[in-house]
Amino acid sequence: MATATEIRKDLRTPIVCVMGHVDHGKTSLLDRIRGTAVVDKEAGAITQHIGATEVPLQTIQTLCKGMIGGNIVVPGLLFIDTPGHHAFTNLRSRGGALADLAVLVVDINEGFQPQTVEAIKILKQFKTPFVIAANKIDRIHGWTAKNNSPFLQTFNSQPDHVKGIIETKTYELVGRMSDLGFSSDRYDRIRDFTRNIGIIPISARTGEGIPDLLMILIGLAQRFLEESLKFQVTGPGVGTILEVKEERGLGYTIDTIIYDGEIRVGDTIVIGGREKPYSTKVRALLKPKPNREIRVEERFDRVNKVTAASGVKILAPELEKAMAGSQVRVTKESNVEDIIKEIEQEMEQAKIVTDEVGVMVKADTLGSLEAIVNELREAKIPIGRADVGDISKRDIINAETVNDPMYRVMLGFNVTILPDANDYLQTTDIKIFNSDVIYHLIDDFRKWETEQRALAEKKKFAEIVRPGKVKYLPNCTFRQSKPAVIGLQIMGGMLKPGVTLIKPDGSKIGVVRQIQERNENISIATVGKEVAVSIDGPTAGRQINEGEIYFVDVPEGHSKVLEFQLKDTIKQDELETLMEFLAIKRKDNPFWGR
């Protein structure tokens, strides 16, 4: 199908964000599209840094093999590769997400995973149109690969049982999408893409289905984004910082996506800094060659100007103060103060509202901080402080001011623990969790919290006087007094040395000194046991008599904890004994222990 290409000069390249669960094939998909091999350089084949790849229309037309019909007006696609998917929240322009479209990569064999669901929630939050690339169709048993073929062409040549598996796996994805509130189907069965999410089965390894994916993305951009892609061709550039990094021979640089206007060498720019916004001057602009991802440091072109939408590396003084996720805005010298005020207001709006008591959160960028705070809020984990930057000694000192041991905790997302903080950490009980995957952070914290609560409960239990009901056994008076030694049967709860015993009328008997079973001292006697007990205070035959029932005298504060905090954790016989004991105490004072 022949394609007319009258690229509109007032439309910028649509920005496409690639998201998905770890190892589901995000980077492999981009590699297949651009024909480079960044994956091989990545630790564990997982994307570690944010990148951007400009894929010109000519490349897309070659890959699509004439599938795209009609007049193409967009100049290509700019793909952003996000580590995990949380950097997506970093890539935002004022008032919404920076990405115009998103590709959610899902392993068709594994289906939705925790990060897949997190990604969909974020896309929904930012109202970003997206498609699903159901990757790894080549892993389906019996699949015969046809490299770089359109999906329907390769699908129709497969055996019937393989087609059946693809259909089943696709409808499993449709079902999961329905659970999350989205209508979806395989892309070739959709007539209205405004109401349905397209699922495109692909293989990043063989290239199958990728022509269909590019065709759908170009179609969506043409049909639904034309208005939002209009930009000021010569207006002052506006962009978002993807990453701040120090390059050998260049010093500090900022990898930036320019999404409006243009930026030139020599321009004054205002940048959102870690402390506050500030201005600097562009010394150089490095533009990746088309099809080359911005992370691959070799062979950049030095250019005089860059027009939206584009990934560019900016060289300028004082970039070490810049903060990833914040804005870059080109301005005249005379307007610098006004723009600084505008960015300050935006940063103020982005500040996190914290709880009175909670964990401390540190993240590498504003967007990351927002992402982790959203997840913590959903997990109902209170946040005491939230800030951008590495973990310092001052942060640990601040965490030490928290009294609740459950919240003397710091959660670090994509940050490092500074050396002075590491040294100080050895002298304190502050707990730090650090990860670059949000759900790992939350899982690790939850696991630790459960363990700590169990330990605290155990400790609380160990310190609390527990209820007990005992019977003075007939013919079991071994010594009458100083101390009285008698035989007792534990009828409910437990008996430990050191507790005071009372009668059902509330009168005190004395203090249990020792408990013996078969002539051996024991530290606890539980329900059903018959033991010899020495008691300081009473004389057998006078204050105490065989056949009588006695109760452990539980202090009022302890009984409150048992009745109102630990009620669900104690055994039935102990609970019944507690209730009998409370009835004795409340006979004269109904509010005792309440």
From Swiss-Prot:
Q: Name the SUPFAM superfamilies for this protein.
A: Initiation factor IF2/eIF5b, domain 3, P-loop containing nucleoside triphosphate hydrolases, Translation proteins
Annotated spans, G1: 20-27
Where is GTP bound in this sequence? 20-27, 81-85, 135-138
Q: Where is this region: G4?
A: 135-138
Family annotation (Pfam families): GTP_EFTU, GTP_EFTU_D4, IF-2
- Would the keyword Nucleotide-binding turn up in this protein's UniProt record? yes
> Keywords assigned by UniProt?
GTP-binding, Initiation factor, Nucleotide-binding, Protein biosynthesis
Q: Which GO terms describe its molecular function?
A: GTP binding; GTPase activity; translation initiation factor activity
User: Segment G2: which positions?
Assistant: 45-49
Q: Which GO terms describe its cellular component?
A: cytoplasm
UniProt cross-references to InterPro entries, sorted A to Z? EFTU-type, P-loop_NTPase, Small_GTP-bd, T_Tr_GTP-bd_dom, TF_aIF-2_arc, TIF_IF2, TIF_IF2_dom3, TIF_IF2_dom3_sf
Residues forming coiled coils = none
G5 as annotated region, ranges: 203-205
Q: Where is the tr-type G domain?
A: 11-226
Q: Which HAMAP family does the protein's record reference?
A: IF_2_A
Q: Which family does it belong to?
A: Belongs to the TRAFAC class translation factor GTPase superfamily. Classic translation factor GTPase family. IF-2 subfamily.
Provide the function of this protein: Function in general translation initiation by promoting the binding of the formylmethionine-tRNA to ribosomes. Seems to function along with eIF-2.
Specify the protein name: Probable translation initiation factor IF-2
In the UniProt record, what gene is named as encoding this protein?
A: infB
